[in-house]
């Protein structure tokens, strides 16, 4: 079963302001995007499990025109605050890379 890192063209994260991070998973072709979408694996519920936040606090969007999935979720620590280890939010996508997708 392939992992997100093996089938997505892009998997990245970044700050969406000081209190949220956004994660994008983008596919190179429509066929693979549709196969992944059909599995339902990439979801707010998955993000909630991976990032330990309630699913209700996650804004999850399937962006058909961009062949992408996008999740915006609250940061545990505000960007740049004491204890923040990723001030730009650029490493937050890492747990998603190892998710198996049954395509």
Segments from the language model and where they lie:
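Long, contiguous binding/interaction regions
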Residues: 1-103
């Amino acid at each position: 079963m392939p992992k997100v890192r093996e089938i997505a063209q892009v998997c990245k994260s970044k700050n969406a302001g000081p209190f949220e991070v956004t994660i994008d998973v983008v596919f190179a072709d429509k066929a693979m995007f549709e196969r992944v979408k059909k599995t339902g694996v990439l979801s707010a519920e998955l993000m909630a499990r991976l990032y330990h936040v309630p699913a209700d606090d996650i804004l999850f969007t399937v962006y058909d025109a961009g062949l992408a999935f996008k999740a915006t979720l609250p940061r545990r620590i505000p960007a740049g605050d004491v204890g923040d280890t990723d001030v730009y939010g650029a490493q937050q996508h890492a747990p998603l890379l190892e998710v198996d997708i049954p395509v």
